[in-house]
Design a protein with these regions (language model features):
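A glycine-rich, often tryptophan-bearing local segment used as a flexible ligand/cofactor-contacting loop or short
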Residues: 4-69
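Soluble or luminal CAZymes and related metallo-dependent hydrolases
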Residues: 6-10, 101, 135, 139
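Secondary-structure transition/capping residues
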Residues: 25, 47, 76, 151-155
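Catalytic beta-strand/loop cores that center a nucleophilic Ser/Cys/Thr
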Residues: 45-120
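Extracellular ligand-binding/catalytic regions of CAZymes and related secreted enzymes
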Residues: 105, 113-168
Length: 168
């Protein structure tokens, strides 16, 4: 299904689920998916070009998402995504991609929206065997664990506070 073909009702449900506490992981071209754009509130546009060598640097070794990785890992062939990436400033940037053609990209970005956690991970072009790389698999596994809900609500409300702060 093409990004634009996702019904708005589905986007509404995904957004509400994240705001209520569901974790969400967006891979590669999901940066242009309707749910990601809705959750980011921007176009999520970026620069790109055909496959080149990428070195992915761990810029936050304390993050649970980067546990078990070295200083960097390499992807022999990956679609280049380059800045400017039109997203809000991440709450936490954990991975930075550098390409042999000189571009850099915010490759692993963490966000909090409402009660939910979001992780965007850039690698994964369909014409490249990226998901067979052990470090890429580890990032995704770690991200799934990181995104597990810590707190969930059943509905999104804005209740009136019925009790006074203090008695007179």
């Amino acid at each position: 299904m093409k990004h634009g073909d996702v019904p708005d009702e589905v986007v509404d449900r995904v957004q509400a689920s994240v705001l209520k506490g569901m974790g969400m992981i967006f891979l590669h071209s999901a940066h242009h998916s309707k749910p990601f754009k809705r959750l980011m509130g921007t176009t999520c546009n970026l620069g790109w070009r055909d496959e080149v060598f990428e070195r992915v640097w761990v810029v936050d070794p304390a993050s649970p998402i980067t546990q078990g990785l070295g200083k960097y890992f390499e992807i022999p062939e990956e679609e280049m995504y380059g800045e400017r990436f039109d997203i809000p400033e991440p709450d936490r940037l954990v991975l930075l991609g550098w390409y042999e053609t000189g571009e850099v990209f915010r490759t692993g970005c963490c966000f909090k929206r409402g009660n939910g956690k979001i992780f965007y991970f850039q690698p994964g072009h369909e014409s490249c065997p990226t998901y067979h790389i052990p470090e890429v698999q580890l990032v995704i596994k770690n991200a799934v664990r990181w995104a597990v809900p810590e707190y969930r609500v059943s509905e999104l409300t804005c209740p009136m506070v019925e009790h006074p702060v203090r008695e007179k």
